[in-house]
Amino acid sequence: MLQVFLVRHGETVWNASRQIQGQSDSPLTAVGERQAHLVAQRVRSQGITHIITSDLGRTQQTAKIIADACGLKVVTDPRLRELNMGVLETRPIESLTPEEEQWRKQMINGTEGGRIPEGESMAELGRRMRAALDSCLELPAGSKPLLVSHGMALGCLLSTLLGLPPHAERRLRLRNCSLSRVDYQESPWLASGWVIESAGDTAHLDMPALDELQR
């Protein structure tokens, strides 16, 4: 049975200031770096064999901290990027016009054809995230990969594995540097294919490393 660990990146400057990131980028805050070190300590004894990350800076920063703790190198996969938020990227959430907020809500609510101009649909996000996960099946037997990605991207992936629509990701709370795990099993009496073992685990994060919602 293949086990794949999933980690969301640490808190970023734009997470803290409530700006839309998408595939634009901002660096980890001091809190985000601490979160990354804590999740690294959590997984270093799990026998991780591969660290695969989105090619965006915030995930690469997080992945490097984890890889150093595990004695591994980082491999990038652009399919693990966050949803492309088009013309709204870099914008403070509070600055959106009513029309722009409608674009955003239609997309996250699963309205047919919903997408931000110059951006990506939730269905497109789900397909590329699933392709990235399925690529783990091609790794050598006995591998235990860890993927570092983004909040909406990972939520969309987990939703689709459950047979839910991609926009169900908004019902999953995946905090910065939370840890999830999915397993690929082949069984005559259990559901074959990908199953979710855990999602959004933050047991490794201490109080200073938790976001305001958790506190």
Curated annotation (Swiss-Prot):
Q: Which reaction does it catalyse?
A: (2R)-2-phosphoglycerate = (2R)-3-phosphoglycerate
The residues annotated as site (Transition state stabilizer) are 150
Where is substrate bound in this sequence? 8-15, 21-22, 58, 82-85, 151-152
Specify the protein name: Probable phosphoglycerate mutase GpmB
Please give the HAMAP family that the UniProt record associates with this protein: PGAM_GpmB
Q: Name one Pfam family in it.
A: His_Phos_1
| Claim: Isomerase is one of the keywords in the record | yes
For this UniProt record, give its keywords in alphabetical order, as a comma-separated list.
Glycolysis, Isomerase
| Example of a GO MF term | phosphatase activity
What EC number(s) are associated with this protein in UniProt? 5.4.2.-
Superkingdom of origin organism: Bacteria
Q: Which GO terms describe its biological process?
A: glycolytic process
Q: Which GO terms describe its cellular component?
A: cytoplasm
Q: Which family does it belong to?
A: Belongs to the phosphoglycerate mutase family. GpmB subfamily.
Give the metabolic or biological pathway: Carbohydrate degradation; glycolysis; pyruvate from D-glyceraldehyde 3-phosphate: step 3/5
Q: Write out the catalytic residues in the record.
A: 9 (tele-phosphohistidine intermediate), 82 (proton donor/acceptor)
> Which organism encodes this protein?
Yersinia enterocolitica serotype O:8 / biotype 1B (strain NCTC 13174 / 8081)
